[in-house]
Amino acid sequence: MPPKTKGRGRKAEARKKKKNSSPGVEAEAKHRLVLLEKELLQDRLALQREEARRAKASEDRLKQRLQGLEAELERTQSEGKAIYAEMSRQRQALKEELGTRSKQLEEEVRSLKEQLETCQREAKTAKEEAERALRKQDGTLAQLHAHVADMEAKYEEILHDNLDCLLAKLRVVKPHWDANVLRLHTRLKEQLRQFGLNPLDL
């Protein structure tokens, strides 16, 4: 350091003067040496004080920076805890919501399965009843067709018999009808002539 170099130079110079000087000069040299050493000590003390001041300022800055970092860390940790707590709350809420929804869906699926089974049973029963009704209806229709065919045959036979009987009766009474019609016709023409009418003009 510069003060040390300066001190050493002065000490060497003082030693040289000490060898070649008188007692008064030696005393003066000692006095100067003491002053130089005092000055050197003051310089060292000032330097140490400056270094201490700088170290204290650096320490204060570091402490301030450390406090800022600690505050930022605490704030970050607090925010992190708040975020974690909020995420945990949302996760729990979502879990509960999903659990509730899952139970609802399971209940709906169970209910739909029961309804489906009921509908299938009812459809099967209705199909069986419809098939039985169709078979019964087919049997009834077959019986009706047979009965109608039998009745048609009987009615046709009765009709033919009645027509034959009627024709036979007509053949028996036709000669009498013809004579009566002829007499009636002759009488009507005579009556027309009596009224002065010609039957051929009518």
Swiss-Prot record:
Q: Which UniProt keywords apply?
A: Cell projection, Cilium, Coiled coil, Cytoplasm, Cytoskeleton, Flagellum
Coiled-coil annotation reads 26-146
Task: Please tell me whether the keyword Cytoplasm is annotated for this protein.
Answer: yes
Annotated GO CC locations: cytoplasm; cytoskeleton; motile cilium
Chief subcellular location: cytoplasm
* Top-rank lineage group of the source organism: Eukaryota
List the residue ranges of the region (Disordered). Answer: 1-30
Q: Where is the composition biased (Basic residues)?
A: 1-20
InterPro entries, per database record: DRC12-like (IPR033585)
- Compartments (UniProt record): Cytoplasm, Cytoskeleton, Flagellum axoneme
What is the disulfide pattern of this chain? none
Q: How does it assemble?
A: Component of the nexin-dynein regulatory complex (N-DRC).
What the protein does? Component of the nexin-dynein regulatory complex (N-DRC), a key regulator of ciliary/flagellar motility which maintains the alignment and integrity of the distal axoneme and regulates microtubule sliding in motile axonemes.
The family this protein is said to belong to:
Belongs to the DRC12 family.
What name appears for this protein in its UniProt entry? Dynein regulatory complex protein 12
What species is this protein from?
Mus musculus (Mouse)
